[in-house]
Every structure is written in structure tokens, then in C-alpha cells.
UniProtKB/Swiss-Prot annotation:
Entry protein name: 8-amino-7-oxononanoate synthase
Species for this entry: Ralstonia pickettii (strain 12J)
Subunit structure: Homodimer.
GO biological process: biotin biosynthetic process
PANTHER family associated with the record: 8-AMINO-7-OXONONANOATE SYNTHASE, CLASS II AMINOTRANSFERASE/8-AMINO-7-OXONONANOATE SYNTHASE
InterPro entries per the UniProt record, alphabetical: Aminotransferase_I/II_large (IPR004839), AON_synthase_class-II (IPR050087), AONS_Archaea/Proteobacteria (IPR004723), AONS_Proteobacteria (IPR022834), PyrdxlP-dep_Trfase (IPR015424), PyrdxlP-dep_Trfase_major (IPR015421), PyrdxlP-dep_Trfase_small (IPR015422)
EC number per UniProt: 2.3.1.47
Amino acid sequence: MRLLDDLQAGLAAIDAAHLRRVRRTAYSPTDRSQRISVPGEAPRDILGFCGNDYLGLAAHPALVEAMTQGTQQYGFGSGASHLVSGHSIAHARLEARMAALQGEHIPEADALFFCTGYMANLAVVSAMAQAGGIRPAEECTIFSDALNHASLIDGARLSRAPIKVYPHVDLAALEALLAASTSRNKLIVTDGVFSMDGDIAPLPELLALAERYDAWLIVDDAHGLGVLGENGAGVLSHFGLHSQRIIYVGTFGKAAGGSGAAIVGHRLVIDWLVQRARTYIFTTATPPGIACAVEAALDLIASEEGDERRARLDRHIAVWSAHAQRLAARFGWQWMPSPTAIQPIVIGENAPALALAAALEHEGIRIAAIRPPTVPAGTARLRITLSAAHTDADIERLAQALEAAGQSLQPAKAA
């Protein structure tokens, strides 16, 4: 069969380029260390530096209890989409909580809860490109950072609006594109914290451009909510921004430890999304127990315990940054300084990045080797992510293991 032959050839090409992805199976709750297996091997305990559980909340007893109680109260499933009969009071409470949280930064804010961050980003970009029923191909232009998350890129593509990609955080290039645009509506789309580099978008400058050129600013704060800003309120709080032009996407699958996402914007923006966001309209609502757990996670994030966890994470970032800078200089890698939990070290080609990741996993440490197309060709990297759940000893163990792996694989440079 020709299709299967084509698939086999495509998979062979993926293997030849060292780009095959392999799933691992976890046998224990998400934590700093998990019991994990890879295909063909028995499960074993692995110390993880590759997840997004930045505050160590994924298995927090209070959140497990909140989900259990919510499920007991409202049942397992929602039974329908939000616009039919699946919109629970648990969903409504969470939306009100997010609207209040970001309402300090977005006047007349309302919020809309989605099953995943990916679905939220598909919705906000594609639906806002058709705001008010305009023809997106003729009356809206999307301005997208070159390193935006795949979900923002896909949302732009689905919108059928023209897309102008500007070099990563290049404000001059973006301004030139905005100045040349004659579109009725303009959408500037950006990650708040970039998922592969760990840098924070220059949101004050982006908002200034949005105001100057009558554009809207869509911010995906997947990696900022919970860890940045006052009481972990996110990247808008981090910068102290305030504008009706901001549309905010907060994701609950990272620092909040759960799943789902909420879009926060002016009440008319949210009402439009209810009417036109296909990934909201045409899917079963998230189980209400998850909404209950996420609301409890937001409580915990804003609490004294949340402050303590953020402080611990910040200490880990400072200690690890010193190790990473030293190791990168020793082995000829590129250290990418980041003030966030995302701490990438660029190795370059795919094969050595995979070899380093394999050597670390052999020693019981899991770090993802990120390769194209997730990152540009020639920038394969170890994407190290830190968590408040890690201990000081974990950070030292990682530094020692990475140094040993680098020395064994690159003895000439290590001399």
C-alpha cells in the first residue's frame, strides 16, 4: 500500500535525522522524581528536569482533595459542551476568579475557560482575526514573534488572515511592519515567556506599539502564571501593565499543576469568543472536578505557601545558572541566561544533544533533548526546567552528572 510505504519512508527519514520522538510511561504521580519506563525497559526511578510543574503542585494533597470533592459534588463528566448543558458552576467560579485576577490589568475583564492551552490559543487568534464579522484575509493582519508557541502559529494559520512574522523580540522590525500595514484590525501575538528559550517578552514595549498603531496585544502566559508577578499573578503583573488592548491567555497545566486554560479580555472580547471560538463551542466541557482543583491551585499560588515555593524556585534558578554558565564555557555549549524556570543549554546538532540526554538518563536524570522542528535547525538543546519541588541536592546532582556526561562525550574540549 502506497500510503504505508510513504509512512515507512518518512519515519526512516526522521530516524536518519535523529528526530524520532519516544514516549515514556510514568507509574507514579508527577513529582521531582518519578518511576518511569521507556519502551523495552523496566520502570525505574528518574529524577526529572524536563516537566512544567514549576511549583511542584501537580500532586499536592490539597489539589487532589479539591478535585475529589468537586467530582463527588458534580460528577465525573460535564456531559455536553458549554453552550448546551455542560457549563457548571465550577467553571463559572473559575472564570470569575481569573477575570478578577487579571482585572487589575484589563478593564471590564471577563474570562472563558478552555480544555487546554492549545485550544485557547487556537480560539483567541482565529476568532479575533474575524472580530465583528470582518473578512480576515482582507481586513486583519497578524503580527507574530518568530519563536511563538505552535498553538499561536496554528491559530494564525487557521484564521486565514495575512501573517507577518517578525524576528524574535525585534521591536524595530515589528514597528516597521505595523507602520506599513493598512489593515483595519491588527493583532500582535506573543508568548509571555518563550517556552524554548526561557526569556520574557518585552511586553511594555509591545503594548506601546499596539497603542501607537491601533493594534491588539494577545499574550500567552503559559509559563508565567503562578511564577511571575505579585502573588504569582503572571506576566501582566510582573510588568504592571494596564490596557483594554490586552487579551491574556493563562494556562493551568504548568505552575498551577493541572490542565486547561482561560482567556481573559474585555467583556466584549469574551462575548465574541463565546459566539465564534470553535474550540470552545464544539467540544465537551472540561470535567468540573478539574475546574475545582484549578481554583484551589490559584488559592495556593496566592498564599504564603505559594510565596515560599516561588522563593525556593528562584534560589534554584540562581544556583543552577552559575553551574550552567561554567559548564557551557567548558564544553563549548551556548548558555542561554533566563530568569525563569526554563533553562536551556544549546548544544547545536541533534546527535550530540541526544547523546547527552541519553547519558544523563543512564545516570537516572531525565532532560528532554529538544530538536527541530520545535527549535530552529542547528540549535538542538537540553531544555532543563527547574521546580520548587527540587532539592538543593538535586541541583548539585544535575550539575555533576552533566559535567561527567560532557567530559565523557567531549574529552578534547574538556581538557
